[in-house]
């Protein structure tokens, strides 16, 4: 027969376990609530991006510092391309959302970054003209797309890219580029650290480079996370209540019956 001290110790251990198990529904409920706030933030971000992309193109600010808060906004510029200074960044894949009808378009290729001299100030900026298949990367194989003279184009302000662990280092001295480092590219071409992505409408008659390669992907899967965390919270809470009720009937967790005299 269990002594009163052993029963008390068992009850204490059982009580501690119950409260430890209760932390699971509490924590998962908190995670579900946090995902609600994340979902609201993501929806606000998406709305902001859509508003920027839907606005009419603005003039490019004369002060590059003014572009700090203009990423993904549309701008219009007039000037001339400096094709002899272009830089090829790759390997890259084409953004098929823009050219969904071109089923035979190769997947692998590069993006063409070309210095662009502004007509009004004489300053040079960088323009990502878009995608070119690997076979047509050499300029002489896409001569029709090397537009000459003064042109007006619309683009989307970008801040460049960050190098990830799996992307090699750029080699400016060899004109070899794996990722878009705006400041290094601009310095290498005596340009302002300003980059715009040419829109799809800026694709030249020759077909390449294919503009409209700005890839804006904002994942918003927070609703599924909310459902998941709240479901786990509800299930584990129900399990906790069930175990809590059953625990009192288990051996060692219930006080022995009173002795008969």
From Swiss-Prot:
InterPro entries: Surf1/Shy1 (IPR002994), Surf1/Surf4 (IPR045214)
Keyword entries, A-Z: Membrane, Mitochondrion, Mitochondrion inner membrane, Transmembrane, Transmembrane helix
GO biological process entries: mitochondrial cytochrome c oxidase assembly
Topology with respect to the bilayer: Multi-pass membrane protein
Membrane-spanning intervals of the chain: 17-37, 223-243
Matches recorded under Pfam families: SURF1
Subcellular location: Mitochondrion inner membrane
One Gene Ontology cellular component annotation held by this UniProt entry: mitochondrion
Job of this protein: Probably involved in the biogenesis of the COX complex.
Family per record: Belongs to the SURF1 family.
Protein name in the entry: SURF1-like protein
The organism of origin for this protein: Monosiga brevicollis (Choanoflagellate)
């Amino acid at each position: 027969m269990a002594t009163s001290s052993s029963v008390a110790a068992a009850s204490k251990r059982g009580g501690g376990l119950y409260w430890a198990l209760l932390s699971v529904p509490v924590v998962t409920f908190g995670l579900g609530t946090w995902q609600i706030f994340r979902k609201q933030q993501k929806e606000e971000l998406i709305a902001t991006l859509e508003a920027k992309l839907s606005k009419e193109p603005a003039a490019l600010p004369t002060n590059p510092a003014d572009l700090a808060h203009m990423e993904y906004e549309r701008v219009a510029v007039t000037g001339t391309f400096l094709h002899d200074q272009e830089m090829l960044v790759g390997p890259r894949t084409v953004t098929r959302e823009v050219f969904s009808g071109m089923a035979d378009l190769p997947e692998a290729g590069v993006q063409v970054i070309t210095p662009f001299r502004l007509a009004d100030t004489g300053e040079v900026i960088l323009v990502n003209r878009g995608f070119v298949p690997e076979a047509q990367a050499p300029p002489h194989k896409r001569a029709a797309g090397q537009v000459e003279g003064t042109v007006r184009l619309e683009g989307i302000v970008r801040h460049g890219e960050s190098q990830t662990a799996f992307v090699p280092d750029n080699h400016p001295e060899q004109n070899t580029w794996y990722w878009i480092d705006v400041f290094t590219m601009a310095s290498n071409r005596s340009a302002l650290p300003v980059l715009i992505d040419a829109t799809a409408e800026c694709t030249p008659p020759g077909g390449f480079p294919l503009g409209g390669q700005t890839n804006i992907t904002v994942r918003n899967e927070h609703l599924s996370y909310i459902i998941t965390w709240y479901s786990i919270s509800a299930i584990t809470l129900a399990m906790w209540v069930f175990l809590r009720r059953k625990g009192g009937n288990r051996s060692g967790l219930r006080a022995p019956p009173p002795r008969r005299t």
